Amino acid sequence: MTSQVAAAEVAQPYAQALLSIAQSKNLTEEFGEDARTFLGLLRADKQLHNFFSNPFIQAENKKALIKQILGEGSNPYLRNFLLILVDKRRIAFLESIFQQYLALLRQLNQTVLAEVISAVPLTEAQQQAIIQKVIAISNARQVELETKVDSELIGGVIIKVGSQVIDASIRGQLRRLSLRLTNS
């Protein structure tokens, strides 16, 4: 298993190369959507992640699976990029490469990533309210929400933007109240 620091170090030049290709062909958003889709597949299917990470599986098998996943109508630049990753034995870092690519794309578009943890799934109106709040706080042009549900929060939300955390959850309020009571 690769450490996150090593994976990030290996992934950075590949992510920058992918962004460079995407910019030269005016495909940054299309590649971004493809990266999000691939990340979703890798996170949902651990067998797929393990297949790409396994050094004992033949490169030709990995290439065949990539071609099968992407299909015939896929972007040839992205397909060739993924096949090069297989040839260079860097396909195990695919998740990190796509994460880095999306981070570079957000930076390029002046978009911030806001991780929102709530006790129940958020409605569209609640998501829009959070987006407006994050835009006001961060001065970003756009906000990309990544939502998670954690029933242990009891109620409310926790919003993480970069290193800033806004804890408006009932669990957080109870914890702060408990600290105040123990300190007095």
UniProtKB/Swiss-Prot annotation:
<keyword id="KW-0472">Membrane</keyword>
<dbReference type="GO" id="GO:0031676">
    <property type="term" value="C:plasma membrane-derived thylakoid membrane"/>
</dbReference>
<dbReference type="GO" id="GO:0045259">
    <property type="term" value="C:proton-transporting ATP synthase complex"/>
</dbReference>
<keyword id="KW-0066">ATP synthesis</keyword>
<dbReference type="InterPro" id="IPR026015">
    <property type="entry name" value="ATP_synth_OSCP/delta_N_sf"/>
</dbReference>
<keyword id="KW-0813">Transport</keyword>
<dbReference type="Pfam" id="PF00213">
    <property type="entry name" value="OSCP"/>
</dbReference>
<dbReference type="InterPro" id="IPR000711">
    <property type="entry name" value="ATPase_OSCP/dsu"/>
</dbReference>
<keyword id="KW-0793">Thylakoid</keyword>
<dbReference type="InterPro" id="IPR020781">
    <property type="entry name" value="ATPase_OSCP/d_CS"/>
</dbReference>
<comment type="similarity">
    <text>Belongs to the ATPase delta chain family.</text>
</comment>
<comment type="function">
    <text>F(1)F(0) ATP synthase produces ATP from ADP in the presence of a proton or sodium gradient. F-type ATPases consist of two structural domains, F(1) containing the extramembraneous catalytic core and F(0) containing the membrane proton channel, linked together by a central stalk and a peripheral stalk. During catalysis, ATP synthesis in the catalytic domain of F(1) is coupled via a rotary mechanism of the central stalk subunits to proton translocation.</text>
</comment>
<comment type="subunit">
    <text>F-type ATPases have 2 components, F(1) - the catalytic core - and F(0) - the membrane proton channel. F(1) has five subunits: alpha(3), beta(3), gamma(1), delta(1), epsilon(1). CF(0) has four main subunits: a(1), b(1), b'(1) and c(10-14). The alpha and beta chains form an alternating ring which encloses part of the gamma chain. F(1) is attached to F(0) by a central stalk formed by the gamma and epsilon chains, while a peripheral stalk is formed by the delta, b and b' chains.</text>
</comment>
<protein>
    <recommendedName>
        <fullName>ATP synthase subunit delta</fullName>
    </recommendedName>
</protein>
<dbReference type="GO" id="GO:0046933">
    <property type="term" value="F:proton-transporting ATP synthase activity, rotational mechanism"/>
</dbReference>
<keyword id="KW-0139">CF(1)</keyword>
<comment type="function">
    <text>This protein is part of the stalk that links CF(0) to CF(1). It either transmits conformational changes from CF(0) to CF(1) or is implicated in proton conduction.</text>
</comment>
<keyword id="KW-0375">Hydrogen ion transport</keyword>
<keyword id="KW-0406">Ion transport</keyword>
